[in-house]
């Protein structure tokens, strides 16, 4: 719906980026007792600094930027983001570091909103048990969506068995959106993996460390106007808003002067790379 970025802090008025850092003072759809905007203050924040890093020896180029967010009697942090590319790879290295500039603790929540395009008849593979206890569909309806009459019946089906959503069947009712919370497992290197395998053998991929992002959300949106797939959103909290997530124990307390970091890999895999990753995912799942 958007031809180019829009200069606004409103989340839904500048939408469609491949990767959006969400948080930090709030996250998700605000509940009735919340005051934060949808997905917090970070998504469209006006970064004060930006730079390029080029390493010819390593064959890498990175774009970096920093944003300082200060609210008197409340919050004072520095967020430093970076996106790196390496020659010969179609994967991006995405990182964020959040430094609490206060002397006192800071509450924070984070989610990496990485948006791929759903591919008709693509298949989802990821390091988690494929059952309703580990792949939990959201049954509440946030204020920013208006579901169709058959929506809740589809949600009830997925609540019993999440397997039908693994294939990107264009007939499935992902309109306007379906959201899951997933208990991801790490491999021997401490990494969780998720991918959308394309019919041609290539795949979209995202990988992260659950010790940095212990919560994982999946988002699927397939409408006549918008088509998006969050294969796996690395996060520290689910998306029910600050008050609800605080009650779940999902709000981090970052000590004064401390820094929180996350490192994510995302992008496109060749067919041989995708086949190898599928084997790694199966090995983790089969334990």
Task: Set out the residue ranges of the language-model regions.
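Surface-exposed acidic/polar loop and edge beta-strand patches at domain peripheries
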Residues: 1-87, 91-93, 104-107, 114-287
């Amino acid at each position: 719906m958007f031809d180019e970025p829009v200069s606004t802090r409103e989340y839904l008025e500048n939408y469609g980026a491949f990767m959006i850092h969400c948080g930090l003072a709030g996250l998700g759809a605000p509940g009735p007792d919340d005051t934060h905007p949808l997905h917090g203050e970070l998504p469209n924040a006006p970064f004060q600094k930006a730079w390029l890093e080029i390493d010819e020896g390593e064959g890498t180029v990175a774009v970096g930027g920093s944003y300082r967010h200060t609210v008197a009697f409340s919050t004072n942090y520095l967020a430093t983001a970076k996106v790196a590319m390496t020659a010969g790879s179609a994967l991006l290295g995405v990182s964020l570091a959040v430094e609490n500039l206060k002397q006192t603790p800071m509450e924070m929540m984070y989610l990496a909103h990485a948006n791929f395009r759903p591919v008709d008849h693509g298949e989802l593979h990821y390091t988690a048990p494929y059952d309703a206890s580990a792949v939990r569909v959201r049954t509440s309806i946030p204020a920013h969506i208006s579901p169709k009459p058959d929506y809740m019946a589809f949600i009830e089906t997925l609540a019993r068995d999440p397997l039908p959503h693994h294939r990107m069947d264009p007939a499935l009712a992902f309109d306007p959106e379906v959201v899951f919370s997933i208990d991801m497992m790490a491999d021997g290197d401490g990494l969780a993996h998720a991918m959308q395998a394309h019919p041609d053998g290539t795949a979209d991929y995202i990988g992260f460390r659950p010790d940095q992002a212990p919560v994982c959300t999946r988002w699927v949106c397939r409408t006549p106007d918008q088509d998006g797939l969050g294969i796996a959103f690395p996060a520290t909290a689910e998306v029910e808003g600050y008050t609800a997530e605080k009650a779940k124990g999902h709000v981090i307390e970052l000590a004064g002067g401390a820094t929180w970091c996350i490192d994510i890999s995302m992008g496109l895999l060749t067919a041989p790379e995708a086949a190898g990753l599928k084997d790694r995912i199966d090995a983790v799942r089969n334990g």
